[in-house]
Structures are given as C-alpha cells and as structure tokens.
From Swiss-Prot:
GO terms for cellular component: cytosol. Keywords: Aminoacyl-tRNA synthetase, ATP-binding, Cytoplasm, Ligase, Nucleotide-binding, Protein biosynthesis. PROSITE patterns: AA_TRNA_LIGASE_I. Monomer. It is found in: Cytoplasm. It comes from Helicobacter pylori (strain HPAG1). It catalyses: tRNA(Glu) + L-glutamate + ATP = L-glutamyl-tRNA(Glu) + AMP + diphosphate. This is Glutamate--tRNA ligase 2. Catalyzes the attachment of glutamate to tRNA(Glu) in a two-step reaction: glutamate is first activated by ATP to form Glu-AMP and then transferred to the acceptor end of tRNA(Glu). One of its GO terms (biological process) is glutamyl-tRNA aminoacylation. It is an enzyme of class 6 (ligase). A motif ('HIGH' region) lies at residues 6-16. Belongs to the class-I aminoacyl-tRNA synthetase family. Glutamate--tRNA ligase type 1 subfamily. NCBIfam families: gltX_bact.
Length: 439
C-alpha cells in the first residue's frame, strides 16, 4: 500500500500535492491500494474543515483513494504499541520535566554543542510526581537506508537519542503515530518531502523495535524553491497554496502537469495525470531542488485551456450560449488562466465602464458620440467588419485612433486584445447585450 498523510493544519502546499500525486501514480503503476491518512492528532493546531478541504482538492485534482482513515481514531492502538515496547524493555518512562530539559538545551547552546538527551535523566525528577513521557531507547548503532532518490543516507549513533513516543498526556508523537499506522496498513513505499529525512531514522528504529521484518522504502523529494528569492517556498507564499492556484484559474490537470515536470525527465511537455502513469519513474527525478516558475505554469495552463472540449469549456466559464464557443477559443489565445478568460468574456458581455477607461474629458465625449452612433445601427445587416466600420465612422464623424480605441472599449470592454474583425461575427449576434454602458 502507498499513502498520502496530510495534516489539517493549513492550506495544502504544492509540495504536499506533489507528494500526493507521485504516491498516487506509483500506487496505480504497482496496482497497490492508495490510502489517505489525515494526521489529526495535534488537536491544538488542527483547523476545522481543513480535512474536507484537502479531500476536495484531491478529488478536484483527479486523485482517488481506496481507503480513508483519521489518525486520531487509532490512538488506542498507538498506546497499545507503546505498552508493548515498555514490556519488552525497548522503551522507558522518563520523568524529566520540560523545565529541566529546557535548562539542558540552553546549557548545550551556550557550550556550542548539539543537545542530546541522556538516559540517566529519566528518573532524576521521579519523586516530583511529574506525569512521565515514554521514550524509545537510543540505538548504539548507525541507522542507514537506501533512499529511492537520495541513494544511501546514514545517521551515526551520536545523531540519535532516546526520543519521545508518548507525551505526558499519553498522546503519540508524530513519528510514533506515523510509524504505527504505516505498519498497521502495511505501507511499502513512502514518497514525501526531504524535510522528513530527519524523521526517517526514528521511524526505522520504531519499526525495528516493533518487530517489523518488511522494511519500508523511502523516496524523499527535493524542496521547491521560490523563483525570486531562491529560498524554500513557505506557506506564506501565495503561489505555494494549491487553493490559491485553483482560485487564480489554474486547471487541476495543468497543476499536476507542472508538478510532475519540475525536477523530472518527462517525454513530452503537455500531458494528463493518466498519461503520466504510463511512463513516470522515480529514477528520473533529480536530487537537486526544483525552482517554482509561475510563468511556465501559466504556459502549461494555456496549453491545457486549448485542449478543453466544448462542454467542459462552457461549464468552466459558466457560459450557456454555445454560439460563444468560437469567441472563447479566440480569447483563450491571449489568456494564461481560466480567471483571465472569465474576465475577458465578462467584459465582453457586461455593460462597459467608460468612466474607468477614459483618459480625459475629450476621450469620454468620443466614446459617448460613438456609442450613440452604434446604438442607431443594426449590426446584423453588415456582411463584414469593414462595411460596419465605414458606416460607424460616417455616423460618428470619428476616424483613426479617435475611432478605434473607443470602438474596442465599447465592444470588448478592453483597450487591446483579439483583432476586431475576428470577433465581429460574435458581436453581431450579441450586439444588444454587448453595446451597453454601465450606469
């Protein structure tokens, strides 16, 4: 089984979605079940409704799953596994207070050495009646694993101490709950961000302590860097939020296309998630950080907009009139996102706001003069734009730039865009709706 394990503590990050996509693809390739596990054991950080938002985004992205579980439902199992380790003398109670440990951390900082928990501290404060935590006994050997992307990764014994499995309130720590559940659901491969590399030796030690004989394979994805700062994209970066990208009008298929492409060798530029299942390989992923490029994402989105079938295009733009399909196709040529396309068609069909667009009083007067001339015309009697243009010029007594700029604004709501002769047939059939001024 493969899994994607998001926490409902904020918006879904593109790095998380990338991991979800890769786990989903490999599950499909290997004909294995795909599990979604909502890691909701951190009650203080959970945000109400974020779990459903994550699931809706996954559905919208075309990612389906075979099983959905909430980690909090397994808390009794986590405690049972901790009890097992205590009985087998692989774990122990630690009574050291938070204050004591903070003092030791400060001491290590002042002495410019890494902080490492010492097992002898476990019973120093036992008589103070602190509720204990449960710790896994530190290893006396190195922990190494062969990462599917990073190759061999090794942690020496002095890099690992006796870490906490259960907190004072008997809630499981991230690494313990995560590992227990991975074993419970027989997860065989975990693809996740490289920020989890430091968690992996701890999870391997827990697996070994619990008697697992089937080692899990890990693949840690390089981080995604911001295109401007070159730093890791954080949750504060708008473009790192999948929700923001979707709201900006990026199609799910384009987002998936982009996230599969960056830091990867792909056989073609534009493809769907189903196509990627045919050829995707972890071996083709680079070990170097990927750089986010919004301009390239926009380019891919533009290509996918062009591939939309008529029915989907009408649905996504909320246009009910099939006669406007040709116009939508023309507008797509200059749009990078669905939001831009919707704005184009809205400006075309809505009353025009010349107050917003006029440069001076003279320009406003020219707009009004041309508007009055156009209102007296029956657009449908003209065989082409040229004959329409000549008559509009004659009636308005305008020509050149004084004619064309107001004309474009009155007919499209924009001062630039697709050539008017190309969209004139659509203007003709909708001119009564098109030729309106905002009050």
């Amino acid at each position: 089984m493969l899994r994607f394990a998001p926490s409902p503590t904020g918006d879904m990050h593109i790095g998380n979605l990338r991991a979800a996509i890769f786990n989903y693809i490999v599950a499909k390739q290997q004909h294995k079940p795909f599990l979604i596990r909502i890691e909701d054991t951190d009650k203080e950080r959970n945000i109400e409704g974020k779990d459903q938002e994550i699931l809706e985004i996954l559905k919208f992205m075309g990612i389906s799953w075979d099983k959905l579980v909430y980690q909090s439902h397994n808390i009794d199992y986590h405690r049972e596994m901790a009890e097992k380790l205590l009985k087998e003398n692989k774990a122990f109670y630690c009574y050291a207070s938070t204050e004591f440990l903070e003092r030791e951390k400060e001491k290590a900082k002042n002495e410019k050495r890494p902080f490492r928990y010492l097992d002898e501290w476990a019973t120093l404060e036992k008589d103070k009646h602190h509720a204990p935590v449960v710790r896994l006994k530190a290893p006396n050997h190195a922990v190494s694993f062969n990462d599917a992307i990073k190759k061999e990764v090794k942690f020496e014994p002095d890099e690992l101490d006796s870490f906490v499995l259960l907190r004072q309130d008997k809630s499981p720590t991230y690494n313990f709950a995560c590992t227990c559940d991975d074993l419970l659901y027989e997860v065989s491969l975990i693809i996740r961000g490289e920020d989890h590399v430091s968690n992996t030796p701890k999870q391997i030690l827990i697996q070994q302590a619990l008697g697992s004989n089937d080692p899990i394979v890990y693949a840690h994805l390089p981080i995604i860097l911001d295109e401007v700062s070159g730093k890791k994209m954080s949750k504060r970066d708008e473009a790192s939020s999948v929700k923001w990208l979707l709201n900006q009008g990026f199609l799910p298929v384009a987002i998936a296309n982009y996230l599969i492409t960056i830091g990867n060798k792909v056989p073609k530029e534009v493809f769907s998630l189903d196509e990627a299942i045919e050829w995707f390989s972890l071996e083709n992923l680079s070990n170097s950080p990927a750089h986010f490029n919004l301009k390239y994402l926009k380019h891919l989105n533009h290509e996918h907009l062009k591939l939309l079938d008529d029915e989907k295009l009408l649905k996504l733009t909320s246009i009910k009139d099939k006669n406007l399909l040709g116009l939508l196709r023309l507008f797509i040529e200059e749009c990078g996102t669905l939001l831009e396309l919707k704005e184009k068609i809205s400006l075309f069909l809505e009353p025009k706001d010349i107050v917003k667009t006029y440069e001076n009083e003279d320009f406003k007067e020219r707009c009004l003069a041309l508007f009055n001339a156009l209102k007296s015309m029956d657009f449908q009697v003209y065989k082409d734009f040229e004959s329409f243009k000549k008559e509009a010029m004659r009636l308005s007594q305008l020509k050149g730039k004084d004619f064309f700029k107001p004309l474009r604004i009155l007919l499209t709501g924009n001062s630039h865009g697709v050539e008017l002769p190309l969209i004139f047939p659509y203007i003709q059939s909708h001119y009564q709706e098109v030729l309106r001024l905002k009050a």
